Amino acid sequence: MTLAPLDASKVKITTTQHASKPKPNSELVFGKSFTDHMLTAEWTAEKGWGTPEIKPYQNLSLDPSAVVFHYAFELFEGMKAYRTVDNKITMFRPDMNMKRMNKSAQRICLPTFDPEELITLIGKLIQQDKCLVPEGKGYSLYIRPTLIGTTAGLGVSTPDRALLYVICCPVGPYYKTGFKAVRLEATDYATRAWPGGCGDKKLGANYAPCVLPQLQAASRGYQQNLWLFGPNNNITEVGTMNAFFVFKDSKTGKKELVTAPLDGTILEGVTRDSILNLAKERLEPSEWTISERYFTIGEVTERSKNGELLEAFGSGTAAIVSPIKEIGWKGEQINIPLLPGEQTGPLAKEVAQWINGIQYGETEHGNWSRVVTDLN
């Protein structure tokens, strides 16, 4: 028997009877308010994907023994839609999110889907709530696709039932008053990811264990953890973001933008990939090297002492870039330069402008922006 694929053409739409009015931009807080509708699609091992539904935002009803609650059969994505300067609504590189979502699903034995079908369905969901997509630079619609195992029973095995759902949240800028550089605690006593694990997948199970180390770092005055790994204390990620550092060779004067390689312990960030692509295109090759390589907290410390550490920042969907001003390590502070009178370094500022320009339709870059609807 052939299992039914996820099919956007079969979507059933039920419109809310209680449409919301858009909140003022000043009231938009990440993850606190949601649009009027949600997308759901059930899957069974016997039949495959059922009819997708767009319906009023509502609670889910699950058996208390559902495997998602007991064995963490759960994964998610984070992506955004933007209202552009020419009054269109676009999604930013959704194909990358769908590819990563399928990889996550395969890793924990949940069903996969045709990426284009889910992109189409998410587009239909956004169209249903298009009036709630906020307008203005820094404002966007955060999209949270989620896939959970819903099999009822306490046995640990491959789920034979699953639920795909998507909810959306109008959000404002990560930094409401401009960049705010953060202090990090280099963390070697807790591990975010390890070889053979699933640190490169967007599983909920990767996030909860990182909260306690973050609280511990916060108690010492740091905003986030700089995750280290292995006997050499390789730098991996910062908080829930990919990490970038900028070094300068004191002999040649050439600068290097470096981030950790995708070795299975690093999340394949969409923003990370975008930064690497744009840096290779737009930075002068005679002045810059773009590297994906291992580097350690020891190297950062040494290059800071030699005046070769120019900048550092995290990257992710929520903030695009998060400038770093200080790293605490073994009782010492590594100070990272910022632009005079600003809370960012020069490259982080430039990178944010590059990506914002594409997201808000000021510049084009291949097929990175996928039009959902034209509001003109």
UniProtKB/Swiss-Prot annotation:
Isobutanol and other branched-chain higher alcohols (BCHAs) are promising advanced biofuels derived from the degradation of branched-chain amino acids (BCAAs). Degradation of BCAAs begins with transamination reactions, catalyzed by branched-chain amino acid transaminases (BCATs). Induction: Highly expressed during stationary phase, down-regulated during logarithmic phase of growth. Down-regulated in the presence of repressive nitrogen sources (glutamine) and derepressed in secondary non-repressive nitrogen sources such as GABA. Highly expressed on cultures with isoleucine, leucine and valine as sole nitrogen source (catabolic conditions). Its cofactor is pyridoxal 5'-phosphate. It comes from the Eukaryota. Its EC number is 2.6.1.42. Cytoplasmic isozyme of branched-chain-amino-acid aminotransferase, which catalyzes the first reaction in the catabolism of the essential branched chain amino acids (BCAAs) leucine, isoleucine, and valine. Catalyzes the formation of methionine from 2-keto-4-methylthiobutyrate (KMTB) in the methionine salvage pathway primarily using BCAAs (leucine, isoleucine, and valine) as well as lysine and proline as the amino donors. Involved in cell cycle regulation. Belongs to the class-IV pyridoxal-phosphate-dependent aminotransferase family. Present with 25900 molecules/cell in log phase SD medium. This is Branched-chain-amino-acid aminotransferase, cytosolic. It comes from Saccharomyces cerevisiae (strain ATCC 204508 / S288c) (Baker's yeast).
